[in-house]
Amino acid sequence: MMEGQQHGEQLKRGLKNRHIQLIALGGAIGTGLFLGSASVIQSAGPGIILGYAIAGFIAFLIMRQLGEMVVEEPVAGSFSHFAYKYWGSFAGFASGWNYWVLYVLVAMAELTAVGKYIQFWYPEIPTWVSAAVFFVVINAINLTNVKVFGEMEFWFAIIKVIAVVAMIIFGGWLLFSGNGGPQASVSNLWDQGGFLPHGFTGLVMMMAIIMFSFGGLELVGITAAEADNPEQSIPKATNQVIYRILIFYIGSLAVLLSLMPWTRVTADTSPFVLIFHELGDTFVANALNIVVLTAALSVYNSCVYCNSRMLFGLAQQGNAPKALASVDKRGVPVNTILVSALVTALCVLINYLAPESAFGLLMALVVSALVINWAMISLAHMKFRRAKQEQGVVTRFPALLYPLGNWICLLFMAAVLVIMLMTPGMAISVYLIPVWLIVLGIGYLFKEKTAKAVKAH
């Protein structure tokens, strides 16, 4: 593709394989693990490890379903394109807009977390101030070009990977060398009331919050339109997700919960930072706080990228205003970045009005949108595969356990919604789902009416 052709309608293919790999990783290691895991530990105890394994398996199935579609048709807008093409125009419209809203909400949650991490050092700084500062900085960087985004995300993710691996190694050394003190023992995983101290119910009730940690893995699909070689980079990035889950989620939590009894974890501080702080290692606690701050900024950076590309894809499909389907001479969709930023700025207001409850509220809304998102990926994939089979096409990167895997994912989503209805503070976000679907329906009818009026003239 020539440079001159990219101005107006085409995104620039500026992401290398290493960028794709690390963007997937950036989506997987964020606030869900570093901050969200605190409330899960309080309810499920060491059983959180099993919870992450179950949710990780579901996330991997979803990733493979999306991966199969993206390898066959690498386009901007990712799965909303597949919902549109293989399911119907309303499905494409609804899934695209839901995905955009999902990542606006994730962006808000990450900015809120940034404020909490800054308060570890400066408790007097309100969360909304930190959110506002980083909001401006990250959006300004994303207005440059996709290579700058790719490089920034690459280094953000490198920092996270090195830090988590170092934390596992250092934690393991403290554990087995005796330098972690008398309380550091693998027996902490079952001694403090058992592996599941509140029974299996305690774990089940936390599955919605655990699911929050995995939102972002599907970013790989969004990068497809700007990947140099999607046929190779997408399968590679997708398959490596399972190892990341094992190492970064399960490995780090197993070490962490062995170093100190899970009962010492508090809900409003990163357990990663807290445990090393409690062990008296201030240097490591400060270093880890830098890492969790980097993690939140990394995911927010990915959100800015993702939101703008999804909105760009919607505009190309005719599901968003045409002005959003343009890029500047560098191949950057400036209009969609600015529109997404404008809505995300509400986060600053939410943190100003309700600093204590902002993160919990945003997390609940994210999970509801994520349930819709993952369910639509699974359903769109079933229709995609059926269409390909009828055409006699053998796909290059088939999903696992089709169609059983799809039904397992859909049942899991339904179970998460039921759990949320039973969880104080989360039920409201489930009640908002029908309202949101009605809003989408009205938006779709308005779009169709406008399109017909334009054709008539």
Swiss-Prot record:
Q: What does the sequence similarity comment in the record state about its family?
A: Belongs to the amino acid-polyamine-organocation (APC) superfamily. Amino acid transporter (AAT) (TC 2.A.3.1) family.
Primary location group: membrane
Kindly state which reaction or reactions the protein catalyses: L-phenylalanine(in) + H(+)(in) = L-phenylalanine(out) + H(+)(out); L-tryptophan(in) + H(+)(in) = L-tryptophan(out) + H(+)(out); L-tyrosine(in) + H(+)(in) = L-tyrosine(out) + H(+)(out)
Residues spanning the membrane: 20-40, 43-63, 87-107, 118-138, 156-176, 202-222, 241-261, 272-292, 334-354, 359-379, 400-420, 426-446
Q: Could you name the Gene Ontology cellular component terms for this entry?
A: plasma membrane
Please indicate the ranges of residues that lie on the Periplasmic side: 41-42, 108-117, 177-201, 262-271, 355-358, 421-425
What is the recorded function of this protein according to its Swiss-Prot or TrEMBL entry? Permease that is involved in the active transport across the cytoplasmic membrane of all three aromatic amino acids, phenylalanine, tyrosine and tryptophan.
List GO BP terms, alphabetically. Answer: amino acid transport; transmembrane transport
- Per the UniProt record, one Pfam family is AA_permease
* Parts of the chain on the Cytoplasmic side: 1-19, 64-86, 139-155, 223-240, 293-333, 380-399, 447-457
Which InterPro entries would you find in this protein's record?
AA-permease/SLC12A_dom, Amino_acid_permease_CS
Task: Tell me what this protein is called.
Answer: Aromatic amino acid transport protein AroP
Membrane topology reported for the UniProt record: Multi-pass membrane protein
Location comes to: Cell inner membrane
Keywords from UniProt, A to Z, are: Amino-acid transport, Cell inner membrane, Cell membrane, Membrane, Transmembrane, Transmembrane helix, Transport
Q: Which gene encodes it?
A: aroP
